[in-house]
């Protein structure tokens, strides 16, 4: 899996899982995931943990990457966006299928854009733009043929937990 990690600045208000997005914002984000997944065989999953379970945020991200079944997609082209809200930690993990198609800096760019949005308190805009960007690269490398079925291999609803795992 490919990954990028960053800790977004702690200068803002500490937030819990339910406080990161309100229900309407969450619905917009889930619809954005579905919209982009309709264009590709790739899968985009977002997991929001209230806090990390240890000091190693990547360990938590990898735990959810496996637990949510992202490594079990047909084309190994799933992507996890992992957020630990109270610890201000963000990671993106791409499975081997998509990792082999993009430059490692791609993930770092997405993390940077998301962190800038979080710093500006534009969480929904940042998350939607990140999903759109990931969706676009998935559609570029894993496009659907006109007659190809596209089962939703992984749930589009946001995954949430109290701790990283």
Protein language model features and the residues they cover:
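A structural boundary signal for the start of the first folded domain, especially the loop/turn
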Residues: 1-77, 85-165
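Short basic (Lys/Arg) and small-residue
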Residues: 81
């Amino acid at each position: 899996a490919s990954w990028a990690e960053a800790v977004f600045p702690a200068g803002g208000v500490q937030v819990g899982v339910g406080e990161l997005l309100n229900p309407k914002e969450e619905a917009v984000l889930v619809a954005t995931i579905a919209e982009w997944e309709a264009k590709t065989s790739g899968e985009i999953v977002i997991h929001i943990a209230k806090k990390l379970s240890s000091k190693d945020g990547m360990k938590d991200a990898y735990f959810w990457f496996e637990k949510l079944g992202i490594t079990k997609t047909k084309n190994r082209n799933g992507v996890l966006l992992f957020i630990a809200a109270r610890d201000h930690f963000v990671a993106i993990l791409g499975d081997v299928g998509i990792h082999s198609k993009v430059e490692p800096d791609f993930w770092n760019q997405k993390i940077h854009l998301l962190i800038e949005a979080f710093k500006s308190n534009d969480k929904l805009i940042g998350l939607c733009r990140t999903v759109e960007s990931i969706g676009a690269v998935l559609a570029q490398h894993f496009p659907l043929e006109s007659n190809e079925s596209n089962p939703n291999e992984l749930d589009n609803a946001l995954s949430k937990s109290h701790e990283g795992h």
